[in-house]
Each structure stands twice: as C-alpha cells, then as structure tokens.
Swiss-Prot record:
HAMAP family found in the cross-reference section: ATP_synth_gamma_bact
PROSITE patterns found in the cross-reference section: ATPASE_GAMMA
Name the UniProt record assigns to this protein: ATP synthase gamma chain
Transmembrane segments: none
GO cellular component assignments: plasma membrane; proton-transporting ATP synthase complex
Keywords, in A-Z order: ATP synthesis, Cell membrane, CF(1), Hydrogen ion transport, Ion transport, Membrane, Transport
Subcellular localization, as worded in the UniProt entry: Cell membrane
InterPro entries named among the record's database cross-references: ATP_synth_F1_ATPase_gsu, ATP_synth_F1_gsu, ATP_synth_F1_gsu_CS
One GO MF term attached to the UniProt entry: proton-transporting ATP synthase activity, rotational mechanism
Functional note: Produces ATP from ADP in the presence of a proton gradient across the membrane. The gamma chain is believed to be important in regulating ATPase activity and the flow of protons through the CF(0) complex.
Organism: Bacillus cereus (strain G9842)
Gene3D superfamilies on file: 3.40.1380.10, ATP synthase, gamma subunit, helix hairpin domain (1.10.287.80)
Length: 286
C-alpha cells in the first residue's frame, strides 16, 4: 500500500492538473463563443454570392467557364483542415483518418493521382510521416482567422485547378454541429457543378456581361467556400478542446476523490496501528 506521503503528493499533483485543465476549458469556451459568431456572420455573405452565381448559371445559356465545367478526372486535390495544437479529443484524428482512408481507397497512395493542401501543424506532421503527397501547407493560423489569412492559399488552390494540376478539388474539415458534436465533412469545391440551386433566384441585370462577372465572382465564391469551412472548423476545434478539457477535469476530480478516500483509510489504519501499539505496550508494562 502507498504511504500517506505518496498519496498526499498524488492528490496535490492531480489538483494542479485539474486547475490547468479547468483553465483551458474556460479559455476554449470563450474562444468558441467568438468562433461561433464568426462562422454565423459569414453565412449571409456566402449565401448571397452563391445566389448571384446560381442566378447567372441558371439564367444564362452558353456560358462556358472552366470552374463550372466537369472534366475527366486524372488527378484530385484535397484541402485538409486540422489544428496547430492538440488536446482536442478526436478533432484531428477523425478527419486525418477519414482522409487517409479515402486516398488509399481512391488512389492506392499513388502520388500521381492526388495532391494534398493541408492547414494545421498536426495534420502536416501526420501526413508527412506517412508519406502522403503534400504540395502546399499553412500553419500558425490564429484562433480567429480573417479572410486575408487564407486568401493566398485559396487563390493558389484555385489557380492550380485552372492550370490543370488537378481536375477536382475537395475539402475535408470538422463541421460544427454543437458544443459536444462535430462531424467530419467532405465538400466539393471545384468544379462548381452543383452551384445551381432549386430555390427561386432573384433576377439580376448584369453589367458588364455575365461572362466577365463570372471571371471575378467564381474565384471569390470558391475562396469563400474554403474560408467558410475554416471558420466552421475553428468552431469545431474550440468545442472539441473545451469538451476534452472538461472530461479531463471531471476525471481528475474523480481521481482526487478516490485518492482522498485512500488517504483517509490509510490514515485511519495508521492511527489504529498506533493505538494498538500503545495499548500493547501499556499491557506489557503491567
């Protein structure tokens, strides 16, 4: 049985750990509130730009733009959103496991058939160690990234599609459902074959021509899809870390309760032993 000193040291150490995890839980909760607001605030912009693009695509005939047209797929691009820091439960492992399985099944790890653009240090390190074909990366993004932070990468990804580096582009990230639930999600970014909507669209008059507007608007729309996924993923990251730290704090408190019970029992046994020895010694003197 552990000594009273050992048990007390474990209690002290566990209490310190619980204080750290509780603080991290509170920090993540604060970051989550802002990340949720950022993600929600971006939705109206994304919906409006999609509405305009859909209006052009549905109302105009004969428009030919490479970002709207599917072509034979010889190579596929993947954008993978992960985090720079861990301690977030299954946030990173879930999306990385999904992407790894998809690439093995679709491409048999043939680097001539796929390319990966990865966001986040943990995702980059994981994929590099396992020999995946990474062609671009971004690390060190803030907890609340601006559009400027991601615009260059999104522009490069779209330019590579236009240049034929790959024939389709998917994005993988954790979609924020609630504070306790996040889902690994796959969205097709390019080509924009599904941009048209069944919903009634507003009639617009375009000046200059629809083709000229699409040259500017389609890249912006594709970039907004990437940025929207990043904001969604950031909310999921903070939620996952908050949940993980709450679980760690709860587990620490259970350990403290168990250790305290063991400490009290050991102390009681020690006191009983001392009393027994005193009584035994007194009896021997009689």
């Amino acid at each position: 049985m552990a000594s009273l000193r050992d048990i007390k040291a474990k209690i002290t150490s566990t209490k310190k750990t619980s204080q750290i995890t509780k603080a991290m839980e509170m920090v993540s909760a604060s970051k989550l509130n802002r990340a949720e607001q950022n993600a929600k605030s971006f939705v109206p912009y994304m919906e409006k730009i999609q509405e305009v693009v859909a209006s052009i695509a549905q109302g105009s005939k004969g428009i030919n733009h490479p970002m709207l047209n599917a072509r034979p797929v010889k190579r596929t691009g993947y954008i993978v959103i992960t985090s720079d820091r861990g301690l977030a439960g299954g946030y990173n492992s879930n999306v990385l496991r999904t992407v790894s399985n998809v690439i093995r099944e679709r491409h048999n790890m043939d680097s001539n058939q796929y390319s990966i653009i990865v966001l986040g240090r943990l995702g980059r390190d994981y994929l590099k160690r396992r020999g995946f074909n990474i062609i671009d990366e971004v690390v060190g993004l803030s907890d609340h990234p601006s559009f400027t932070d991601i615009k260059d990468l999104a522009s490069r990804a779209i330019a590579m599609f236009a240049d034929g580096a790959y024939d389709e582009l998917y994005i993988y990230y954790n979609h924020y459902v609630s504070k306790i639930s996040q889902e690994v999600t796959e969205n097709k970014i390019l080509p924009l074959t599904d941009v048209a909507s069944d919903k009634p669209t507003t009639a617009y008059e375009f000046e200059p021509s629809e083709e000229e507007i699409l040259k500017v608007l389609l890249p912006q729309y594709a970039e907004s899809l990437v940025y929207g996924a990043l904001l969604d993923g950031k909310a999921s990251e903070h939620a996952a870390r908050m949940t993980a730290m709450k679980s760690a704090t709860d587990n620490a408190m259970e350990v403290i309760d168990s250790l305290t019970l063991s400490f009290n029992r050991a102390r009681q046994a020690a006191i009983t032993q001392e009393i027994t020895e005193i009584v035994g010694g007194a009896a021997a003197l009689e």
